[in-house]
Amino acid sequence: IQWATVGAVVAGILFVYIEVTQRNPYYQFDVLKLRTIRFGFLFYFLLMVLNSSSMFVNVFTGIGMKLDNYQNATLGNWSMLGYFIGGIATIWLSVKGVHFKYLFAAGFLFLGLSAMFMYFEVQGAGLYERMKYPVIIRSTGMMFLYSLIPTFATQRMPYKYLSSWICTMLTVRMVLAPSIGTALYSNVLQERQQHYITRYAQNVDMMHPEASASFMQTVQGMQYQGKSKQEAVNMAATSTKGRIQVQATLSAVKEMAGWTLYACLFCMIFVVVLPYPKRKLLT
């Protein structure tokens, strides 16, 4: 990964150098002078980073509910309904003349509502049937932003910048932002998971009534099945560790869902207070 990162940075610097020194470059850096284009890149970056929170559903169903990949993939199919709802709502609100900033804010609002749903839903007795709701809500918000960002960014954009816009947009939307978002959420999840494992394991010993009773019950059960005492103790310890890991993972997901909600609220306020260029509608 380190060498791949170094290679990507070197290749990027080399590309910029070649394009700057050429008389007729393929990439027009003047595209970055357009304010709507810069806003479009920024909004796509925020969207794709926050969209990495989709991992909450997979982590919760995989760890908390012990579901397989097929059942997780089945949940993903509900995103089509969210895209449909978001598409219809986007068209209807656009026809009504709602300003772009409120539509962008609505998109981040739905992403935040999905995170809020996961915050309150993550628990040891969660229901599989309810996991389709955060998928639908998040997909609805994604459709708002996915469809409107390029429409907003390319307003009155000169045709000569089209290829440069597409190149940069795909780089931000498909490479930079998803990789940064995935790395951020994965590393933070692992770090918070280890934090909660250490925190919960401190109180789990033979002096703890519930932990001690569960441990001894598992040891006796293993011995009844013909296991030796040492094997039974090892399996009981593994079982206790597994329960702690599950609880730690659920706590980490709940905490990250809360921070994602705050991030979405910040993005909502941010896209509303930005100074947008005035549109001149042709009649």
Model-derived segments and spans:
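Phenylalanine-glycine-rich, low-complexity intrinsically disordered regions
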Residues: 1-2
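Transmembrane-helix signature of multi-pass solute transporters
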Residues: 10-11, 110-120, 266-273
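Structural signal for alpha-helical transmembrane segments and their membrane-water exit/capping regions
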Residues: 11-22
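Hydrophobic alpha-helical interface/terminus motif in multipass membrane transporters
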Residues: 19, 61-62, 153
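Short helix-capping/hinge motifs at transmembrane helix termini and TM-loop junctions
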Residues: 22-23, 121-126, 158, 193, ...
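Small-residue-rich alpha-helical segments with characteristic i,i+4
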Residues: 131-211
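Hydrophobic transmembrane architecture of multi-pass small-molecule transporters
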Residues: 174-276, 282
